[in-house]
């Protein structure tokens, strides 16, 4: 009955876990919890959106419903996803536009996309990154509209304005980033499908 859930940003890490414990024991998940550590025992929450879990083959099984209901009953809102792969890509659209740029420029969402004098340029660049990522998602069998991609990006930026991406903190503290599972995964999947 043991299952493994990974809420790591990006895509591709589940395959690594599956190669160790088997496909049937791994369920997919995605969460958006914007927070950072202020010090020992002190964490600032900049906002959150519901978490999603699901079977990689699709559909909502009894175990997915049970896990989602248990988390929700303990004040951690979790939704059973019919298509967890699409949910993970939905977050990935935002991550590809927010994480690397936030890390490169060491900026919070507000400074990067809202109060920035070059706001139109940074939002335009973010949109371009998202639309390129969408082309890869479509090639990988994920049916997602342009509006859906941009909605998630805008929702994260607008609801978590004081947040700085985890990638920016990783760079700041000289930790390994999740870039291989975010932009790197998009590049790898794009090459596999011949997307340029």
What are these regions (language model features)?
Residues 8, 55, 173:
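Conserved residues at beta->alpha junctions
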Residues 73, 125-196:
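NAD(P)-dependent Rossmann-like dehydrogenase/reductase catalytic/cofactor-binding core
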Residues 13, 59-63, 99, 163, ...:
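Short phosphate-engaging motifs
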Residues 28-31, 83, 149, 182:
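Proline- and acidic/polar-enriched loop/turn elements at helix boundaries
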Residues 10-11, 64, 130, 183:
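Generic non-transmembrane alpha-helix signal with a bias for helix starts/N-cap capping motifs
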Residues 20-25, 40, 44-145:
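Internal alpha-helical scaffold of NAD(P)-dependent oxidoreductase catalytic cores
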Residues 33, 86, 152:
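Positions that flank functional sites
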Residues 1-42:
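Rossmann-like NAD(P)(H) cofactor-binding subdomain of soluble oxidoreductases
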């Amino acid at each position: 009955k043991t299952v493994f859930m990974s809420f790591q940003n990006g895509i591709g890490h589940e395959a690594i876990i599956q190669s160790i414990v088997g496909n049937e024991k791994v369920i997919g998940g995605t969460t958006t919890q914007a927070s950072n550590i202020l010090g020992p025992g002190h964490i600032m929450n900049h906002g959150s959106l519901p978490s999603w879990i699901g079977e990689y083959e699709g559909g909502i099984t009894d175990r997915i419903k049970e896990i989602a209901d248990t988390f929700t009953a303990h004040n951690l809102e979790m939704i059973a996803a019919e298509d967890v792969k699409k949910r993970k890509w939905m977050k990935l659209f935002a991550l590809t536009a927010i994480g690397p740029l936030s890390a490169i420029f060491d900026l919070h969402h507000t400074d990067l996309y809202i109060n920035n004098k070059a706001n139109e340029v940074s939002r335009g660049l973010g949109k371009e990154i998202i639309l390129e990522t969408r082309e890869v998602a479509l090639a990988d069998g994920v049916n997602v509209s342009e509006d859906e991609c941009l909605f998630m990006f805008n929702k994260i930026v607008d609801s978590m304005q004081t947040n700085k991406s985890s990638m920016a903190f990783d760079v700041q503290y000289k930790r390994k980033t999740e870039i291989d599972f975010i932009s790197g995964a998009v590049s790898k999947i794009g090459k596999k499908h011949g997307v340029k």
